[in-house]
């Protein structure tokens, strides 16, 4: 490859060459879901984005430890320091234990990720399983002088921290403006400044989720878990931290401050953020009530959907846009993605049957380079897909007798097409598996068509037509060619 991998670092607002701290090892941390409801399209985007990164880093030969956390405590409503824990509220409404809620939705989240062909992370730590580490983090920040205790809670002193470091380095926010605005809005409470954020919150006896600490019974602030767990599993400095763009502030800004305050230096080298999924121009999310769950996409059971969309259609739809660009939901866009993916899968299915010649009229020499150049340019998946569409046209041309290809060029085409479509973009052909098995299903179809061919040879048109008509009624397209019959599932 002529060009090394470059990724956009939100911290410096530019693309930078990726250079691991401890090559060939790479530490990757991605913020996972707060599990109090079914996963929706907005959850699918970061999962698929960083699955693409994970796959590509491994393909490049790196040994990747991928940590994606599960938030099951401390995430209050509206991402605030006051209010009710999202999971505790769900548990109260449904008259369940909080961990019942967590287990139910976490299981459903994992099933959805499996359907989307998202590889499981190396480690999937849960916030509630790392209370000791979070308490230790808070103690370190207190000892360094960047936090204070108030009414049994502990808050990060943003103004004090900003005197020695810079709060706002990731988001670009101005600390003076933030302090002035929060003073006008919040008035006086437990905090010295409204911009200060909770490291540990005191909990009343009726609070369902609470733990003992040096400051009394309580629970950790939302921002603590990622700093504590990232450091535990990836060390005091690791390569990449990813998440949705909506986490830049306050979550990731607070993570940076916590790390610097507790250990004297930043913990992350590259910050990567995917953009939002929008619906009618607004961010799709639970807080706005405008979300469509992944299960609803898969089943079509939502009034905004014209039909059901397969998991691979959803994955292809998301990868059809660059991860830093917005993606606006529409049925038209999903249907276009569905048709585009089908074209590529059809082309992939033709690869094994293409006949070679001594000469080639199809140019495939730069296909691999185009795909690698696109991936190395900040994971430019739309450009990879564009190159694959060009390759699909070449495959179809050879298949239709409008071009020729040598055996060496065909092997290059097969290897590159399958590497980028299946191994890296993570697509899989659901059509055969959804009909009850892939290889066995294909062999059964070939057997049926061979019986039909024998019937035609005997001029048994009734049997031949019956097989064709019955298969058509079941949703298959049967096409007779000079080399025999071909089939596909519509």
UniProtKB/Swiss-Prot annotation:
Stated EC number for the protein is 6.1.1.16
Cofactor(s) required, per the database record:
Zn(2+)
This protein's encoding gene:
cysS
**Top EC class for this record:** ligase
Self-association or partners: how does it assemble? Answer: Monomer.
Q: What is this protein called?
A: Cysteine--tRNA ligase
The molecular function GO annotations come to: ATP binding; cysteine-tRNA ligase activity; zinc ion binding
Name the positions where ATP binds: 286
What's the short name of a Pfam family annotated to this entry?
tRNA-synt_1e
The cofactor note reads: Binds 1 zinc ion per subunit.
Binding-site residues, Zn(2+): 31, 226, 251, 255
Reactions catalysed:
tRNA(Cys) + L-cysteine + ATP = L-cysteinyl-tRNA(Cys) + AMP + diphosphate
> What is the superkingdom listed in this entry's lineage?
Bacteria
Q: Which UniProt keywords apply?
A: Aminoacyl-tRNA synthetase, ATP-binding, Cytoplasm, Ligase, Metal-binding, Nucleotide-binding, Protein biosynthesis, Zinc
**Annotated Gene Ontology cellular component terms:** cytosol
User: Which family does the entry's similarity section mention?
Assistant: Belongs to the class-I aminoacyl-tRNA synthetase family.
Report if keyword Methyltransferase is assigned.
no
Give the matching Gene3D superfamilies. Answer: Cysteine-tRNA ligase, C-terminal anti-codon recognition domain, HUPs
Q: Where is this motif: 'KMSKS' region?
A: 283-287
Q: Name one GO biological process term.
A: cysteinyl-tRNA aminoacylation
Cellular compartment(s):
Cytoplasm
Residue interval(s) of motif 'HIGH' region: 33-43
